[in-house]
């Protein structure tokens, strides 16, 4: 999930005509997009939830880090441009015996000389405990080539044995973080299982986080997803766009809100859906791009199934909202 500050172009001051509000759309079907990692043959290679972040030593160079193999290591790939040749580097390996090293996300530190990588990690000898952790690594330098465990408790004499645990909870996973200039805070969005919801936390330093608040629950009846997954939030023109995956790997639900901590009702305020799974959204030269991995190209496949293996990338285009879409945006004055 990409570490970029998405700032508002214009403040959202009261209701706007739907034609003034932009909605994200896929530019092509995923089968016509560019596969940047993995093999198209089902089962040959496994790539799933991942992050993308741009290098500060070589500004055109991009890094991707994500789930593969047995899911207790993270792959690392680099490319000289978004649509260039992605080359695999040595894995970022967990030194623990615990399985389930999931869904990384990286964001540059406030000083800009390093980056923090958040990931879900199981607790217990086999990672099977219900209670799990959100952990953090730090880049050894601005080239992002080497990552080490970050000591969250460096200033405390008494600290947990595993010092890179940021917080624990019932399967906290799939973090997405950005700096919200309007709040002067970092916001982390992530999926959780108790409650089954998308949660949000805030931070001044991108390391120490507030208590969580739920920003989006699951539908009841469970039409769109059973367990929320892979939230991704961007802020554009004073609005917050929440992309959230779920049980069906073919669908990503879209919600739009004026409030970063409340996206309304999961059914009534669902603006729409796009095809895909575990989206990562990046911005380069004024254009937005969306990447997804392990995609079901058509809704209705078995849970967790996909027919497009690997990681795919395409431009995310924006067009005026329809009147029906605009009506589902969550407004602060409608609380």
Regions found by a protein language model. Give the residues of each.
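Carbohydrate-active catalytic/glycan-binding domains of CAZyme proteins
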Residues: 12-335
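Bacterial N-terminal signal peptides
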Residues: 1-9
């Amino acid at each position: 999930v990409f570490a970029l500050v998405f700032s508002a172009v214009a403040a959202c001051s009261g209701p706007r005509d739907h034609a003034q509000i932009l909605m994200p759309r896929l530019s092509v079907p995923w089968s016509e997009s560019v596969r940047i990692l993995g093999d198209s043959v089902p089962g040959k290679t496994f790539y799933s939830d991942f992050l993308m972040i741009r290098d500060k030593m070589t500004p055109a160079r991009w890094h991707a880090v994500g789930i593969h193999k047995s899911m207790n290591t993270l792959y690392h790939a680099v490319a000289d441009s978004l649509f260039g040749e992605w080359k695999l580097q040595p894995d970022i390996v967990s030194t623990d015996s615990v399985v389930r090293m999931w869904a990384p996300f990286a964001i540059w530190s406030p000083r800009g000389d390093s980056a923090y990588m958040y990931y879900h990690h199981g607790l217990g000898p086999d990672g099977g405990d219900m209670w799990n952790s959100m952990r953090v690594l730090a880049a050894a330098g601005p080239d992002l080539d080497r990552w080490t465990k970050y000591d969250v408790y460096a200033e405390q004499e008494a600290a947990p044995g595993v010092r890179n645990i940021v917080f624990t909870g019932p399967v906290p996973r799939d973090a997405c973080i950005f700096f919200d200039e309007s709040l002067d805070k970092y916001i982390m969005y992530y999926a959780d299982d108790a409650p089954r919801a998308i949660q949000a936390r805030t931070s001044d330093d991108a390391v120490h986080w507030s208590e969580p608040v739920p920003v989006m629950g699951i539908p009841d009846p469970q039409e769109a997803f059973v367990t929320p997954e892979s939230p991704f939030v961007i802020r554009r023109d004073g609005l917050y766009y929440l992309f959230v995956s779920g049980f069906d790997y073919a669908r990503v639900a879209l919600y739009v809100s004026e409030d970063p901590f409340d996206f309304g009702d999961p059914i009534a305020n669902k603006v729409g859906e796009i095809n895909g799974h575990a989206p990562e959204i990046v911005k380069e030269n004024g254009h937005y791009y969306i990447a997804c991995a392990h995609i079901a190209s058509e809704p209705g496949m078995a849970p967790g199934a996909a027919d497009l293996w690997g990681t795919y990338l395409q431009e995310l285009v924006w067009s005026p909202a329809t009147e029906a879409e605009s009506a589902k945006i969550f407004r602060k004055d409608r609380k």
